[in-house]
Regions:
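N-terminal acidic leader/helix
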Residues: 1-26
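Serine/threonine-rich low-complexity intrinsically disordered regions
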Residues: 2-4, 40, 49
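Mixed-charge, low-complexity intrinsically disordered regions
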Residues: 5, 19, 38, 67-70
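Generic alpha-helical secondary structure signal
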Residues: 7, 25, 34, 50-53, ...
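Generic structural signal for hydrophobic core residues of well-folded globular domains
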Residues: 16, 20, 31, 59, ...
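Amphipathic, hydrophobic secondary-structure cores in small proteins
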Residues: 17, 23-47
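Long, compositionally biased
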Residues: 44-70
Length: 70
């Protein structure tokens, strides 16, 4: 289960990076700074059943709500 969660978060970071034309390190730092990595960890069971496109949008909104500027 932990391996699946890690794979999912890595894939989500990659999709987020592609969507916003950033690199994976920038996105990982951004998501960490605004609490999205913790969100992905705690809400994995729901998030992994949704499309990456929807989750990129949801994570972006979550980060924005917490002070992110993307």
């Amino acid at each position: 289960m932990i391996y699946d969660k890690i794979q999912y978060i890595v894939a989500l970071i990659s999709e987020f990076a592609r969507h916003y034309n950033l690199n994976d390190v920038q996105v990982a730092r951004y998501m960490s700074r605004y609490g999205a990595l913790d969100l992905c960890d705690s809400e994995y069971e729901v998030m992994h059943t949704q499309s990456f496109n929807d989750m990129v949008k949801a994570v972006a909104e979550y980060c924005k709500h917490n002070g992110g500027l993307l």
